[in-house]
């Protein structure tokens, strides 16, 4: 009995990452033993993701407004190099996906298209939607978790209150600390939430439906692994001039794992902000760069759009020259940056990319259908890469500034 208590206390008092690993293992075991119980555990996962999604909009709004209002004269938020890394990283991810698709060409067994889905008609529509999100009603932006709109209003309010009395600034600062406290409490519940998510996912799918798409998943996941373990570390090394892997693995472990199971960049914003605080990054920087990254830093989405589009091209027997492939990389990168402005995200931007090759919308929507089938893995890996990269690039720019 004492041994059991000792084991339980070790689990309770363990590092959060170890607790998450234990939650993953427990979820797999439960799904293997009882599918019904595992499906019931979905409530725990839903509550955890719901809590993160609920707190994220108000966290971003209060933190950004407080940070700008309390900003000291002459301080530098370091946003330009961070945004540059976001955009360059997304483009390099698309180029990596093109290279992998040429090296390991895949074809698809097309299925019924995604019913009721409404893809954008062109790149202009994607960008137009993104721009109009800036002028959204602030209450509606908070209600719908429109982070572009939330950022715009928070920045505007922060600038307006920058010259307010110190008491007003202190109220904003105290509110940001209060919301941060709630976030830390929710994050401590991550092992329980991830236990529920893992148990339900395995019980619902068993991953058996993915067997027919092994080669496609191989190219997708291989591209994402190359970006996470080769391209991103190289970019960070160029920035900080020292071994990037300790920072890379910290971001993957503490941000990527949670994002993988929540499958939501928005839900992972509080996790990323807590990690930035742990890495001693200036709040002025990460309070803006993390929610902005959740909107425009979309390396995983660029890979998904590129790989599935080229798989459709191969299936239709269309020959692709290098110039067109490079053009696809640029279109995929720009589209990926606007993925947050499209319901359904990266998958519903595939018809836009397919239009480059004259592929009909009917066929393109069947490709989207394939995307939904493999989504349990593709969407998880995509979100893990996107979200962990937000912290990685923010931390890299912070360390580069400290070094200079």
Curated annotation (Swiss-Prot):
Compartment(s) of residence: Cell inner membrane
A molecular function GO annotation: neutral L-amino acid:sodium symporter activity
Gene Ontology cellular component annotations, sorted alphabetically: plasma membrane
Membrane found in the keyword field: yes
Membrane-protein topology: Multi-pass membrane protein
One BP term from GO: threonine transport
Keywords, ordered alphabetically: Amino-acid transport, Cell inner membrane, Cell membrane, Membrane, Symport, Transmembrane, Transmembrane helix, Transport
TM segment ranges: 11-31, 44-64, 82-102, 144-164, 179-199, 218-238, 290-310, 316-336, 363-383
UniProt catalytic activity: L-serine(in) + Na(+)(in) = L-serine(out) + Na(+)(out); L-threonine(in) + Na(+)(in) = L-threonine(out) + Na(+)(out)
Entry annotated with the keyword Cell inner membrane: yes
Function: Involved in the import of serine and threonine into the cell, with the concomitant import of sodium (symport system).
Family to which the UniProt record says this protein belongs: Belongs to the dicarboxylate/amino acid:cation symporter (DAACS) (TC 2.A.23) family.
Name assigned to this protein: Serine/threonine transporter SstT
Species whose genome carries this gene: Desulfotalea psychrophila (strain LSv54 / DSM 12343)
Gene this protein is translated from: sstT
């Amino acid at each position: 009995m004492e041994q059991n208590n000792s084991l339980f206390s070790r689990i309770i008092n363990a590092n959060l990452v170890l607790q998450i690993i234990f939650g993953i293992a427990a979820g797999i075991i439960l799904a293997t033993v009882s599918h019904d119980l595992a499906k019931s555990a979905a409530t725990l996962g839903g509550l955890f993701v719901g809590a993160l999604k609920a707190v994220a909009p108000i966290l971003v709004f209060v933190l950004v407004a407080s940070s700008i209002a309390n900003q000291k004269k002459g301080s530098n938020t370091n946003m330009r190099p961070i945004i540059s890394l976001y955009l360059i990283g997304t483009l390099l991810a698309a180029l990596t996906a093109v290279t992998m698709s040429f090296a390991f060409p895949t074809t698809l067994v097309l299925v019924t298209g995604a019913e009721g889905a409404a893809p954008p008609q062109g790149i202009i529509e994607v960008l137009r939607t993104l721009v109009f999100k800036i002028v959204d009603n602030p209450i509606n932006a908070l209600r719908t978790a429109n982070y572009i709109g939330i950022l715009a209003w928070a920045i505007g309010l922060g600038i307006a209150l920058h010259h307010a009395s110190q008491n007003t600034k202190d109220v904003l600062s105290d509110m940001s600390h209060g919301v941060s406290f709630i976030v830390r409490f929710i994050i401590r519940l991550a092992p329980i939430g991830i236990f529920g998510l893992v148990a339900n996912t395995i019980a619902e799918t068993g991953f058996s439906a993915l067997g027919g798409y092994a080669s496609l998943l191989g190219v997708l996941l291989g591209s994402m692994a190359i970006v996470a373990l080769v391209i991103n570390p190289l970019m960070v090394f160029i920035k900080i001039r020292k071994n990037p892997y300790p920072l890379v693995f910290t971001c993957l472990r503490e941000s990527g794992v949670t994002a993988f199971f929540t499958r939501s960049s928005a839900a992972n914003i509080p996790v990323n902000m807590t990690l930035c605080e742990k890495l001693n990054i200036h709040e002025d920087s990460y309070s803006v760069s993390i929610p902005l990254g959740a909107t425009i830093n979309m390396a995983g989405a660029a890979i998904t759009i590129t790989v599935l589009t080229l798989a459709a091209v191969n299936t239709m027997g269309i020959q692709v020259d290098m110039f067109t492939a490079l053009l696809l990389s640029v279109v995929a990168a720009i589209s990926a940056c606007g993925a947050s402005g499209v319901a359904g995200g990266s998958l519903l931007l595939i018809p836009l990319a397919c239009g480059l090759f004259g592929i009909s919308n009917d066929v393109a929507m069947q490709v989207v259908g394939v995307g939904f089938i493999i989504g349990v893995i593709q969407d998880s890996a995509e979100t893990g890469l996107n979200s962990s990269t937000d912290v990685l690039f923010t931390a890299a720019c912070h360390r580069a500034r400290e070094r200079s």
